[in-house]
Amino acid sequence: MAFMRSKPSLGSLARVAFRWCGPGVGLVNYSQEPYLVKAVQGKSKPRSPTLQSAMQPRAQAETIQAPKCFGEDSFFFSSTPKADVMGVADGVGGWRDRGIDAGRFSRDLMQRCFVHAQKPTFDGRNPRQLLSECYGEMKRKWKPILGSSTACVVAFNRSESALYTANLGDSGYVVIRNGSVLDRSEEQTHFFNMPFQLTVPPPDSNREMWFCDDPSEAVATRLLLQPDDLVLVATDGLFDNMPEQMLLEMLSKVQGVHEQKAIQEAVNRVVERAGALSINPIYKSPFCLRALENNVAYGGGGKPDDITVVLASVAMRQCNTVGDSNESKGSDLRPRLSFP
């Protein structure tokens, strides 16, 4: 089956010109390499009705790469010569009833993902393995951090111009091309409002009491990207409150825009809107509609929750390399591959 592209692939743009530099020097390729222009925004949910005014957004500039958090959500993004990596994690709030900081687990998970993504050997091709290694480290700690978290990590491999994804639970990603959804993650739940989650339970407890899902259960995909594509990674606080069409409309003005300021302003607007909808008592939110579909009593309105959104635009930049280069080996692969 053939797939038509509306634009040339990034791989086909990789080598645009070269010149001879004399004996012993070889060819200098004047090429364009793909990269992601990123911005992040988030809001912590009000912990009581009187704290709604505390839902103030805090923008994070692209230069800030170390993990940050919004309430019990956490995120990171990383850029190396091989890959741009972005991730979000949503700490499971039920641990608060046991006197445990529900956000500490997600923060530790994203911190470890950030450290691994910064390694020179990590090329972004296996974010599911990255999750597995980090989760394994957390379980092996002498005094492990107890808790649970969903996780979504996406990595853009520059040499292939391909986005590799790993999603466990109800956080997720959306890829937008020409104003339409090209690909979107599917949430994983045991039942309504009970997502798959990575868990470190108390050592003296019965493991069967907990939902202890494994990183191997994360859905992994590969998707070829083109210039101007948008990649959004977010926790369920966004998806539970903002329908897909509204999201597309809000991001339509930055399709093809590569200025970091514009990307930041766009993600600010998305989070601000989602936050307002989450505390609207008469709004028919996606969460409310799914509750009705599952015969779950819900009073209606939005779903107050922490909201974290990372938005990126695929751009090109000039780079000079010495030596003969080959076009992307992945340029003739299917646009989307799922790994079992």
Swiss-Prot record:
Residues that bind Mn(2+) 1: 90-91
Keyword Hydrolase in record: yes
Gene Ontology biological-process entries: dephosphorylation
EC number: 3.1.3.16
Disulfide bonds, paired cysteine numbers: none
Residues of the PPM-type phosphatase domain: 58-314
Cofactor(s) in the UniProt record: Mg(2+); Mn(2+)
Gene Ontology CC annotation, any one: mitochondrion
Keywords: Hydrolase, Magnesium, Manganese, Metal-binding, Protein phosphatase
Binding of Mn(2+) 2, residues: 90, 236
Catalytic reaction equation(s): O-phospho-L-seryl-[protein] + H2O = L-seryl-[protein] + phosphate; O-phospho-L-threonyl-[protein] + H2O = L-threonyl-[protein] + phosphate
InterPro entries tied to this protein: PPM-type-like_dom_sf (IPR036457), PPM-type_phosphatase-like_dom (IPR001932), PPTC7 (IPR039123)
Record flagged with keyword Hydrolase: yes
GO molecular-function terms, A-Z: metal ion binding; protein serine/threonine phosphatase activity
One Pfam entry name: PP2C_2
Enzyme class: hydrolase
Family affiliation: Belongs to the PP2C family.
Name the UniProt record assigns to this protein: Protein phosphatase PTC7 homolog fig
Organism: Drosophila pseudoobscura pseudoobscura
